[in-house]
């Protein structure tokens, strides 16, 4: 019998709900969590109670647990090849990269790895921008203005690790500022159907 719980993106509830599933509902396995924050909040519960979590989304790596199956792509399987593609002639031969993400583990770790990769491939530090916003951020006017300046002269791409409901206002403001894909291509890793 399947048990469904919804912590409603309230990070404090994730561990409590995981404990309920494992100890009260006696589930054999949990499929869930969507962010690194939620995964990291339940990890001690799964390890203490020898539970099994299937984590279904891309993740930043740098973590290994006997109690978690990481089924999503790690940075070297998704984000790094995507950026390498953007640097190639087939991908647009981009020379400038603006790393924009939500302020939590996955974007910060992913962008740390991407920044190191870009520098190792000869991209000057001045051609790498980096910025983070809180969860549920809605006002991208200033950030899109910075991207517009950064992209002046061409050859720029935005690497987006924005999460959740912040995507829609980002794309709207990107368009409101007259930016187009030819001005700054966007490579995004966490976009939903909204």
Language-model-detected regions and their locations in the chain:
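Short beta-strand segments enriched in small/hydrophobic residues
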Residues: 1, 33-34, 96-101
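Hydrophobic/aromatic residues located in beta-strands of well-ordered beta-sheets
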Residues: 2, 53, 97, 128, ...
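Beta-alpha junction/loop-to-helix N-cap segments that form part of ligand/metal-binding clefts
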Residues: 2-62, 71, 132-141, 164
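Cofactor-binding loop segments of dinucleotide-utilizing enzymes, especially the Rossmann-like FAD-
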Residues: 7, 102, 189-191
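Short, well-ordered alpha-helical microsegments
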Residues: 38-40, 79, 167-168, 193-194
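A short helix->loop->beta-strand "cap" motif at the edges of active sites that frequently abuts
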Residues: 49-52, 123, 180-184
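Extracellular/periplasmic Venus flytrap/periplasmic-binding protein
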Residues: 60, 67-178
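Extracellular/periplasmic periplasmic-binding protein-like sensory domains
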Residues: 174-194
């Amino acid at each position: 019998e399947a048990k469904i719980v919804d912590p409603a993106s309230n990070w404090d509830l994730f561990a409590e709900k995981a404990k309920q599933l494992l100890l009260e509902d006696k589930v054999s396995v949990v499929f869930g969590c969507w962010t690194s924050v939620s995964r990291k909040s339940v990890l001690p519960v799964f390890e203490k109670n020898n539970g099994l979590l299937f984590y279904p989304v891309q993740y930043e790596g740098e973590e290994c647990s006997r109690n978690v199956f990481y089924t999503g792509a790690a940075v070297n399987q998704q984000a790094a090849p995507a950026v390498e593609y953007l640097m190639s002639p087939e991908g647009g031969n981009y020379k400038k990269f603006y790393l924009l993400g939500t302020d939590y583990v996955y974007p910060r770790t992913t962008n740390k790895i991407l920044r190191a990769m870009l520098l190792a491939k000869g991209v000057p530090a001045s051609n790498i921008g980096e910025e983070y916003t809180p969860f549920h951020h809605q006002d991208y006017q200033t950030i899109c203005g910075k991207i517009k300046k950064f992209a002046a002269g061409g050859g720029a791409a935005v690497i987006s690790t924005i999460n959740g409901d912040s995507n829609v206002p980002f794309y709207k403001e990107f368009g409101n500022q007259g930016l187009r894909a030819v001005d700054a291509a966007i490579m995004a890793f966490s976009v939903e159907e909204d």
